[in-house]
Swiss-Prot record:
Protein name, entry field: D-aminoacyl-tRNA deacylase
Source taxonomy: Eukaryota, Amoebozoa, Evosea, Eumycetozoa, Dictyostelia
Position of sequence motif Gly-cisPro motif, important for rejection of L-amino acids: 140-141
Species annotation: Dictyostelium discoideum (Social amoeba)
InterPro entries hit by this protein: Daa-tRNA_deacyls_DTD (IPR003732), DTD-like_sf (IPR023509)
Disulfides per UniProt: none
Gene name per UniProt: dtd
Length: 151
């Protein structure tokens, strides 16, 4: 399982001209599900996202001290199978991504676990399988790449 985690001042997802999800300050996370991913991979990614220390402490004297949970910020998750793109020349293949008919339930289970592990009202998401316009205002920018197979 892969995740691209971006610290944001705000982020939103629009589908067919309608804003379906938005957050204020927090994290916008692109989530890719691999064909061999398991529940343990999802739990690892969730734990890392919730506990990464990406913000300064309260008095601003120490960088990289506080997590999204400690800051009580929101998280916007967006499913992104293209994180598993394999390139051969200029053509990409997605054979390492989990099949859509399996990955949808896997993704929904991942979201449920994130809600149980944090605060349900702080977890937002896009629309699985939809063409989405994702807008964000980076904070920093701070961007972290995670891969559950590279622990």
């Amino acid at each position: 399982m892969k995740a691209i985690i971006q610290r944001v001042k705000s982020s939103s997802v629009t589908v067919e001209g309608e804003v379906i999800s938005e957050i204020k300050q927090g994290l916008m996370c692109l989530i890719g599900i691999g064909r061999d991913d398991t529940k343990e991979d999802a739990e690892y990614i969730t734990r890392k996202i919730l506990n990464l220390r990406l913000w300064k402490n309260e008095d601003g004297t120490k960088n990289w001290d506080r997590s999204v949970q400690q800051m009580d910020y929101e998280i916007l998750f967006v499913s992104q199978f293209t994180l598993f793109a394999q390139l051969k020349g200029n053509k990409q293949s997605y054979h390492l991504a989990m099949a859509p008919e399996l990955s949808k339930q896997f993704y929904l289970d991942f979201l449920e676990n994130a809600k149980k592990s944090y605060k349900p009202e702080k977890i937002k998401d896009g629309r699985f399988g939809a063409m989405m316009d994702v807008q964000l205002i980076n904070d920093g920018p701070v961007t972290i790449q995670l891969d559950s197979k590279e622990k």
